[in-house]
Amino acid sequence: MKLSALLALSASTAVLAAPAVHHSDNHHHNDKRAVVTVTQYVNADGAVVIPAATTATSAAADGKVESVAAATTTLSSTAAAATTSAAASSSSSSSSSSSSSSSVGSGDFEDGTISCSDFPSGQGAVSLDWLGLGGWASIMDMNGNTATSCQDGYYCSYACSPGYAKTQWPSEQPSDGRSVGGLYCKNGKLYRSNTDTNSLCVEGQGSAQAVNKVSGSIAICGTDYPGSENMVVPTVVGAGSSQPINVIKEDSYYQWQGKKTSAQYYVNNAGVSVEDGCIWGTEGSGVGNWAPVVLGAGYTDGITYLSIIPNPNNKEAPNFNIKIVATDGSTVNGACSYENGVYSGSGSDGCTVSVTSGSANFVFY
């Protein structure tokens, strides 16, 4: 069973909500999945206000008809202490390209110059060698078929460095709620699927970091989105160090059916390696989609929203505590922590803060 808690700001209140109806697959999972999304709206007291559910299905490359229901639970948590409210989500487009000029890499990507068999590491993309996909995060076509090598007709999705997000996805997305993203392979060469930008990676808002105060390294695994939604995009925070968290600029980033989306991270126990943790996990493994805690991060209308979210796949507390702390001179509305297996605020539903100026840290201690 898979948690899908992709966050998107909704309506005119400071509420984090996720419209995630995504096919998920990787090279270990070539099957047909019926993805069931259950979105829960939660008020400041932790009470569920509105439940909803939708489904989407797609066929895998090998044509197997093994149907798996993947329950998706989304926390929508009101920032009770927020002094401002978020504006209504845009519904004018199903996809929005990033307009930021901040990028990482060695320059602009040139269409048709790199073979599909070569991973474009020099362009800012980060190779994920442990997945066995030639460095790619996922390889999918518009029909939901997957492959283990980048080939004609497929979108080859990739990871970026911590604090950055990929820029490539086609404006035309599957009508059934799945998403695809990455460079497009055509006639053996790689092409941009989003020609509005020449870079492969774009910097996020820069308003959050992960700070590790425990003795072991922590593998934080972002979801491959738009794309497979597998939790394979790594941010590894060594003991006593920090790394930027990609806070998606929602107003200019990918939109799912006209709704803003933000970043989602699965956090493994301290000491779990990136190769063992940033994968599609198995039931009871405690890694990947079975990791003990999930983080959310997004920026819209001048406000950063940061969340600590329970993973319904894993009720066990992690081997660390975590809290969201304002940096010096910053303003954070609300309090959010997960200490000794207990969330602050309403208790078991997770918590959200709004950063109205400056930045904040996810502190692991």
Curated annotation (Swiss-Prot):
The keyword Metal-binding appears for this protein: no
Further comment found in the protein's record: Present with 56900 molecules/cell in log phase SD medium.
EC number: 3.2.1.-
Gene: UTH1
Disruption phenotype: Leads to increased resistance to zymolyase treatment and to boric acid.
EC class of the enzyme, as a word: hydrolase
Originating organism: Saccharomyces cerevisiae (strain ATCC 204508 / S288c) (Baker's yeast)
Bilayer-crossing regions: none
Superkingdom of the source species: Eukaryota
Function: Involved in aging, oxidative stress response, and in the regulation of mitochondrial biogenesis. Inactivation of UTH1 increases life span, leads to higher resistance to heat stress and against hydrogen peroxide, and increases sensitivity to the superoxide radical-generating drug paraquat and to copper. Also required for the selective autophagic degradation of mitochondria (mitophagy) in response to nitrogen starvation. Involved in the remodeling of the cell wall during the various phases of yeast culture development and under various environmental conditions and plays a role in septation.
One GO biological process term: polysaccharide catabolic process
Name under which the protein is recorded: Probable secreted beta-glucosidase UTH1
Location in the cell: Mitochondrion outer membrane; Secreted, Cell wall
Residue stretches in coiled coil: none
Inducing stimuli: Induced by hydrogen peroxide. Repressed by superoxide radicals and anoxia.
GO MF term set: hydrolase activity, acting on glycosyl bonds
Alphabetical keyword list: Autophagy, Carbohydrate metabolism, Cell cycle, Cell division, Cell wall, Cell wall biogenesis/degradation, Glycosidase, Hydrolase, Membrane, Mitochondrion, Mitochondrion outer membrane, Polysaccharide degradation, Secreted, Septation, Signal, Stress response
